[in-house]
Design a protein with these regions (language model features):
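Small-residue hinge/turn detector
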Residues: 75-87
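Glycosyltransferase-associated regions of secretory-pathway enzymes
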Residues: 1-74, 90-246
Length: 246
């Protein structure tokens, strides 16, 4: 398997110029790519992703530019991409603290490594190219697109809902998701202003933390780099720990 970390980001109609904290999350991934055994970062966008995947289902282009629809487009892309190439997928709201060797090392023993038992969290996973579960996920997404023609697809239908039906596939391992995301998403907004966030949510062995952009308040998405630098919100605490330069 190749030591590649894949990411995808496309600006939505709501944030046509991007989201500053997402840029900083990307920088945290880049910052640690020479740590440990190292990894290469390939970050895709709406202009270049077609260079990396084949046989794109034409119905994917019926999805609109809303954040909800772009999330579904990213679900389709990540499945196709990692099936073809293998490596690690990280959503763009991941803040990386250290080397990712502990994740890559899982691929010495399994075809697929992910988080959350019974329903894989697709915001972060690792796999070999041509992994059996990835083939099933890709095929199921094509089935969903062909039947819907890319219209009225609900959130997660091509993501965790699509892959979770294949969790009994041999040679996969699903780990405890709280190892990398210990915030209850239902109450994420309550934790943004914790002053002791590192102590509460991060341990020394943790490779990254997933912020879950869909649940981040709009006013925080509008914070500039300068505002994030001097803020003590949870995102800023994590970015500082990651070593990002604002």
């Amino acid at each position: 398997y190749e030591r590649i970390v894949w990411q995808y980001w496309e600006n939505s109609d709501t944030y046509p110029d991007g989201i500053p904290y997402i840029d900083l999350c990307h920088e945290s991934v880049d910052l640690h790519q020479t740590d440990g055994k190292g990894y290469k970062v390939i970050r895709l966008n709406d202009k270049n992703y077609q260079e990396y995947i084949d046989d794109i289902n034409p119905y994917i282009f019926n999805l609109k530019e809303s954040e909800n629809q772009l999330a579904q487009k990213a679900d389709y892309i990540r499945a196709k991409l990692l099936y073809k190439h293998g490596g690690i997928w990280l959503d763009s709201d991941a803040i990386v603290f250290r080397e990712l060797d502990m994740i890559f090392d899982k691929l010495e023993h399994y075809e697929f490594y992910g988080y959350k038992i019974n329903s894989p969290c697709i915001w972060a996973f690792a796999c070999h190219k041509n992994a059996e579960i990835m083939k099933k996920w890709v095929d199921n997404n094509d089935k969903i697109l062909n039947e819907s023609q890319g219209k009225n697809i609900f959130y997660g239908e091509m993501g965790h809902r699509s892959i979770e039906i294949f969790i009994n596939t041999p040679n996969i391992f699903l780990d405890d998701a709280t190892k990398v995301q210990s915030i209850d998403h239902r109450y994420a907004w309550k934790y943004m202003h914790f002053t002791n966030g590192l102590e509460k949510f991060i341990n020394d062995e943790q490779p990254f933390f997933m912020m879950n952009n869909a649940l981040i308040c709009d006013y925080i998405k509008k914070y500039t780099r300068e505002e994030l630098k001097y803020s003590n919100i949870l995102i800023s605490q994590f970015l500082i720990k990651a070593g990002v330069k604002f």
